């Protein structure tokens, strides 16, 4: 009985998340279209995502995030932002916490979600985790963004761990890029 109630509540939570995500996209649609049209507008796209879209989702889901131990990041400098990944809300939290634009490396499958997938594929670096060539492409696309002074956010576990797993083994990509470009790694949790 308890398991059934948990499944029902989690399903309601997931549906509510997607409703809020859709409301966020709908209310900012003209800006998202304009700012996703070119990489040079990415800082403006990120501003909309950070100050409107993520707030609609976070506050609508009942989250009131508090940023502790806040460090000033140097404007115009690239960073490798890494965090563990527990749920869909993690992306909103990363955007909320990082004032300076970050570009996410994310799984390609999400580009199939109607409307959201369009913007996701325009502004994120997508990886098809089962395709070695795609992983190499992520590396070259990340280099391109880092050379422009944009920071990259990677969840080094490579996805959300199974229930009961606290932390999976990290993949090397984020750390290899940080070493190659001699950029600081900023851990968020």
Predicted features by range, described:
Residues 3-66, 118-122:
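A transmembrane-helix-recognition feature enriched in membrane-embedded lipid enzymes
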Residues 60-189:
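Soluble catalytic domains of membrane acyltransferases
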